[in-house]
Curated annotation (Swiss-Prot):
Residues bearing PTM O-(pantetheine 4'-phosphoryl)serine: 37
Protein known as: Acyl carrier protein
Entry annotated with the keyword Cytoplasm: yes
SUPFAM superfamilies: ACP-like
Function of the molecule: Carrier of the growing fatty acid chain in fatty acid biosynthesis. Is probably involved in the biosynthesis of docosahexaenoic acid (DHA) which is produced by this bacterium as a fatty acyl component in its membrane lipid.
HAMAP family: Acyl_carrier
Keywords: Cytoplasm, Fatty acid biosynthesis, Fatty acid metabolism, Lipid biosynthesis, Lipid metabolism, Phosphopantetheine, Phosphoprotein
GO CC terms, sorted: cytosol; membrane
GO molecular function per UniProt: acyl binding; acyl carrier activity
Location of the Carrier domain: 2-77
Subcellular location: Cytoplasm
Length: 78
């Protein structure tokens, strides 16, 4: 597991209050992890803070799964 992946998953666990074993890469924030729209906004804000980046709204809307969050963070770091 990459450092980025570990950090993203840690944020998801903290923000959504879910168990580590529930945070699978294919998990949907809403359908699998029980997030609502406010949770997803707060999650994006936490990712922005952790990785010192700005995620535009049109990109944030596409971040709906754990893997999408990891992919975005990795691509923005390159």
């Amino acid at each position: 597991m990459s450092n980025f992946e570990e950090r993203v998953k840690k944020i998801i666990i903290e923000q959504l209050g879910v168990k580590e074993e529930e945070v699978k890469n294919e998990a949907s924030f809403v359908d699998d992890l029980g997030a609502d729209s406010l949770d997803t906004v707060e999650l994006v804000m936490a990712l922005e803070e952790e990785f010192d980046t700005d995620i535009p709204d049109d990109e944030a809307e596409k971040i709906t799964t754990v893997q999408a969050a990891i992919d975005y963070v990795v691509s923005s770091a390159e």
